[in-house]
Amino acid sequence: MDRPWGLRPATPTDADWLADLKARAMRPDLERLGLWDRDWARRRFLDTYVSTNTDIIEIDGKPVGVIAVRAEVDAQWIEHFYLDPAVQGRGIGSQILRHVMDAHRDTRPFRLAIDRGSAARRLYERVGFVHLYDDGNGVDQIFGAPGEPPTQP
């Protein structure tokens, strides 16, 4: 299948660019929640960035996004899934998410956390994720893979 994007393994040298991407991609949600602080967003990303489980999304050889899968005993967490706002709204996010889930599929369910009210919720619901529970901090909502019943932590 021809696709307009590709993936390459992330490296430690990608960290600064990725921190800036997160700040750009997350700004609307963080502003809406009254939590926008560019320096904090960068630090939070850099504090949790692990290149070994992260792929850079490229279009025409240029980096436009990132996605990571963190494996735990009972679930695989989709993390740091950000696309440059300039390439959002083209269906690329759905394609990438399905591709990455297929590549990592095993017996564990996929999970992810999003900010309450995030526009990204539509993307995840299109792919089949369902709301499981709110994490109690008033911001994050936890979503599970298709067919997973709502639960509590």
Write out the residue ranges for each language-model feature.
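Conserved beta-strand-loop-alpha-helix junction that forms the acyl-donor binding cleft
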Residues: Q88, R111-R122, G136-G144
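A short helix-loop-beta-strand connector motif used in the catalytic cores of GNAT acetyltransferases and
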Residues: L46-I56, G65
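Hydrophobic adenine-recognition pocket in adenosine-nucleotide-binding enzymes
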Residues: A10, F81-L83, I114
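Conserved GNAT-fold acetyl-CoA-binding loop/helix
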Residues: M26-L46
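A short beta-loop-alpha structural element at the N-terminal edge
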Residues: W5-D20
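Conserved beta-strand in the GNAT
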Residues: K62-A71, W77-Y82
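Conserved acetyl-CoA-binding loop-helix of GNAT-fold acetyltransferases
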Residues: L83, G89-D102, R121-R126
